[in-house]
Amino acid sequence: MIELNAVSVEKSGAPILNDISLSFGQGGITALIGPNGAGKSTLLHAIAGLVAPTCGTVRVEGLDMARARPPERARHVALLAQDERVTARLTVRDLVGFGRWSHHHGRPRDADRRMVRDALDIFDLNPLAERRLDALSGGQRQRAFVAMAWAQETPWLLLDEPLSALDPRHARDIMDRLHALTRPGPAQRSVVIVLHDLGVAARYADRIVALKDGRLVTSGPRVLAMTGGMLSDLFGTGLALERIKGRDVVVPV
């Protein structure tokens, strides 16, 4: 379970998050939505333990993330940051294993190699395994980064705008794979993802956390929380949720 209790974050005296309290259990996809500057990335980094709250607590499976040591945090969450930076000379295989090997001084163990093989299989990366990152398309590269996060074998995947540079086809491919990984089974993970595309949130999210100006607007199951009225208030423009061909679609009104 992820639990935030009265969490506020300030930067240079300016409030970024203001008195956020919410909780949700494992399973499914939780989408963080809201306008630019709402505090979504800061909230995700606070959950990962990389941003310490000015006040309040963040707990993941009972662990106080601000007080925990990095190895303790790494057993609970894997964060894929928006500006993830690694050398372009890495191969896909090396990238996927990078998050595991870094925990024990770069020396892979048999369990690490097995996990990398599983990740390459699950994300259909075997044909690209020995290719360098600078030889990949944007969609292939992002799929490799998500596989790297999955291979860290944590119950929670925290993804900061992983679709931002992708065309609709590659974005849909990533989300289809994430959706499949949240279903029960040995590969199951729980996903918390920052999304700007409301249509993607409407289609894939099980839960919605909506932020505006650093404050929590609503949090809950998508079918209850993601309403046209809430979206219009959140973004300051007329939006509605319509059912089209069996899917919820966000449309302007």
Segments predicted by a language model, with ranges:
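Conserved structural motif at the start of ABC-family nucleotide-binding domains
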Residues: 2, 17-19
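Catalytic Walker B motif of ABC-type/P-loop ATPase nucleotide-binding domains
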Residues: 157-161, 166
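Conserved ABC transporter NBD signature motif
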Residues: 56-64, 73
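Helix-to-loop junction immediately C-terminal to a conserved catalytic motif
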Residues: 48
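Conserved ABC ATPase signature
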Residues: 132-136
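The feature captures the beta-strand-to-loop junction immediately N-terminal to the Walker
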Residues: 33-35
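Conserved ABC ATPase "signature" region
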Residues: 97, 110-128, 153
